Amino acid sequence: MRVAFGGPLFRKKMEHLVKVKDYIPDIRVDLKYASEDNFTGHKIYDFTEAYLRYGTVQKLMKVQEALRKQGLSLKIWDAYRPPSAQFVFWEICPDDTYIANPIKGFSPHSRGGAVDITLVDRTGKELEMPTEYDDFSGKAVRDYPGWTPQAAANQRIVEQLMVDNGFVAYEGEWWHYVDTDKYEVVEEAEVLK
C-alpha cells in the first residue's frame, strides 16, 4: 500500500508529540518551569524533557543543522506545556499580553507547536540576547530599540532561521516561536504515560 505525501497517515505522524532530544540529540534543554528558576518561583512541570509535535521537531532540526555549521546551538527553555500549567500561569499573571488566557483558548505551547529558545555556543554558554527569559517588559518586544548591537544580532540569527523554517515569531517575546502548522491541545496524561 502506498501513502501519498501529505495524506492522512503522513499527517498523523506529523501530529505525534515526541521527545525533542530523540531527534536532535545535540540541542540544549533547560525547561525553566521544571525548576524554580522561572517567573513563578515554583516548579510547575513534573518532567524535564522537551516535547513537541513531530512536524515541529522536523522544522527545528533544520534550524539546529544551520546553527551547528556556525558552531552554535539552540537551547530550549519551554516547549510542550500541559494545560494545567496554563491555568497556574494565568492565576499568577492574568495579563494576556504575556500569558494566554486558558478560558479563551490555550497557548500554542499546550498544543506542542510552540517553543521558547535562546542561542548558545558549542559549550552550551548562552550568548548575549536582548533580555532574560520571561522578561515581562517592553525590552522583550522584537522591535525594542534599546538592545545592544550584539544582542540584536544574535536574536536576528535565530529569528531568521526560525521564520525561514516555518515558524512565526511572537512580537511580544523575542524567545517565542510558533509552528505555522496548527495542532489540537494535548492533555498531560497523553504525553507522560
Feature locations, PLM:
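Short hydrophobic transmembrane-like helices used for membrane targeting/insertion
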Residues: 1-3
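Extracytoplasmic cell-surface/polysaccharide-interacting catalytic and binding patches
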Residues: 5-79, 89-172, 178-193
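Segments that shape or occlude catalytic/ligand-binding pockets
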Residues: 82
